[in-house]
């Protein structure tokens, strides 16, 4: 009937479990992943649209990853970390030197990581812009698809396509590029 209805949203994740001697302590990767997924949930919660098919993560691929990737940036922000990241026994906040090491680590190998993501986008587009059904060697097809982004030799007997769940089972078919495009939007 065209009425505005608010979404029901949950973030469901698997985190490190507590041990007998320690509570559940999140890894940096878990914090970053939580922030990413929380960005998707905020996108849905703040959406204000009459039609759910045009709302939240149902937007154009060019924008779908923007809120989640923005949220990831908070993982290395001192002011944000100081609101919750404390030693589980002493309550001390993270030392500035450790936060700087997190920042430095996030910048390490960033060019290679960028090319790797571009290669995944190229592979995604190669699979979803075919005009005829595929018949052939998947590994050979894959290597041809992403050769423009390869700077290191391909590791023998690897095949990304067989485990690329984002594009074959995760709803990102012909849309994986959105991860890199959102980073361009963020940097503007």
Label each PLM-derived region with a short phrase.
Residues 1-187:
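Cation-handling catalytic/transport regions enriched in His/Asp/Glu
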């Amino acid at each position: 009937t065209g009425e505005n209805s608010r979404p029901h949203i949950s973030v469901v994740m698997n985190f490190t479990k507590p041990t007998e001697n320690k509570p559940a302590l999140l890894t940096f990767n878990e914090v970053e992943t939580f922030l990413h997924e929380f960005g998707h949930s905020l996108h849905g919660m703040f959406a204000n649209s009459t039609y759910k098919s045009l709302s939240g993560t149902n937007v154009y691929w060019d924008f779908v990853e923007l809120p989640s990737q923005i949220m990831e940036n908070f993982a290395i922000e001192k002011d944000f970390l100081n609101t919750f990241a404390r030693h589980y026994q002493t309550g001390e906040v993270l030392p500035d030197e450790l936060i700087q090491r997190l920042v430095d680590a996030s910048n390490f190998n960033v060019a290679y990581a960028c090319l790797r993501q571009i290669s995944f986008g190229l592979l995604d587009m190669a699979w979803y812009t075919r005009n005829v059904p595929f018949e052939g060697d998947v590994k050979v097809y894959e290597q041809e698809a992403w050769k423009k982004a390869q700077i290191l030799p391909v590791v023998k007997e690897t095949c990304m396509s067989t485990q690329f769940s984002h594009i074959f089972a995760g709803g990102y078919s012909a849309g994986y590029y959105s991860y890199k495009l959102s980073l361009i939007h963020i940097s503007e």
